[in-house]
């Protein structure tokens, strides 16, 4: 029984485990494994915490992005409203300005017509006075009648103007 190889292998194995037990290797091995398990658990907890923090940051940035997009849309809408209002005001101002210029042009035309009519009347009066003077001068004596003619012509000129 002691001469077989299996016996000595078994004896060596038992002795090996006895030596390991004597030096408390199993406790050291268990402590190392427990420490390793605790480290892994701590890393998992840290990973969960970081993941939750990342999700919170992501949600925060998504919320900020939505708010920024809404604000940009509001700004664009406000700009459109202001542009439409400015266009309305500009059209109204242009219409008023066109009306003023049209009125001014019409007034200038009316004034020019009046001036032209007055000029024509004055010229006609001067021509009539000159013609009357020549006709009367040819028919009247040079004496008293000339004074009468001059007086009449002066009155006629003042009445026509």
From Swiss-Prot:
GO molecular function: proton-transporting ATP synthase activity, rotational mechanism; proton-transporting ATPase activity, rotational mechanism
CDD domains given in the database record: ATP-synt_Fo_b
Name of a matching Pfam family: ATP-synt_B
InterPro entries in the record: ATP_synth_b/b'su_bac/chlpt, ATP_synthase_B_chain
Chief place where the protein resides: membrane
Transmembrane segments: 1-21
Localization per Swiss-Prot or TrEMBL: Cell inner membrane
Domain of life: Bacteria
Record flagged with keyword Electron transport: no
GO cellular component, one term: proton-transporting ATP synthase complex
Keywords: ATP synthesis, Cell inner membrane, Cell membrane, CF(0), Hydrogen ion transport, Ion transport, Membrane, Transmembrane, Transmembrane helix, Transport
Keyword Glycosyltransferase: no
Entry membrane topology: Single-pass membrane protein
Record-linked PANTHER family: ATP SYNTHASE SUBUNIT B, ATP SYNTHASE SUBUNIT B', CHLOROPLASTIC
The protein's assembly and partners: F-type ATPases have 2 components, F(1) - the catalytic core - and F(0) - the membrane proton channel. F(1) has five subunits: alpha(3), beta(3), gamma(1), delta(1), epsilon(1). F(0) has three main subunits: a(1), b(2) and c(10-14). The alpha and beta chains form an alternating ring which encloses part of the gamma chain. F(1) is attached to F(0) by a central stalk formed by the gamma and epsilon chains, while a peripheral stalk is formed by the delta and b chains.
Function: F(1)F(0) ATP synthase produces ATP from ADP in the presence of a proton or sodium gradient. F-type ATPases consist of two structural domains, F(1) containing the extramembraneous catalytic core and F(0) containing the membrane proton channel, linked together by a central stalk and a peripheral stalk. During catalysis, ATP synthesis in the catalytic domain of F(1) is coupled via a rotary mechanism of the central stalk subunits to proton translocation.
Family note: Belongs to the ATPase B chain family.
Protein name: ATP synthase subunit b 1
Organism this protein belongs to: Parvibaculum lavamentivorans (strain DS-1 / DSM 13023 / NCIMB 13966)
Gene designation per UniProt: atpF1
């Amino acid at each position: 029984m002691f001469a077989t190889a299996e016996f000595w292998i078994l004896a060596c194995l038992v002795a090996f485990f006895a030596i390991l037990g004597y030096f408390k290797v199993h406790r050291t091995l268990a402590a190392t494994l427990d420490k390793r398990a605790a480290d892994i658990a701590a890393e998992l907890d840290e990973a969960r915490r970081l993941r939750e923090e990342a999700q919170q940051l992501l949600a925060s940035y998504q919320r900020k992005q939505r708010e920024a997009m809404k604000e940009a849309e509001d700004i664009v809408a406000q700009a459109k409203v202001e542009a439409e209002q400015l266009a309305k005001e500009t059209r109204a101002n242009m219409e008023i300005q066109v009306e003023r210029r049209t009125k001014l042009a019409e007034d200038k035309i009316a004034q020019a017509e009046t001036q032209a009519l007055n000029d024509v009347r004055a010229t006609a009066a001067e021509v009539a006075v000159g013609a009357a003077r020549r006709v009367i001068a040819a028919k009247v004596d040079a004496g008293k009648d000339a004074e009468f003619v001059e007086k009449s012509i002066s009155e006629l000129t003042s009445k026509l103007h």
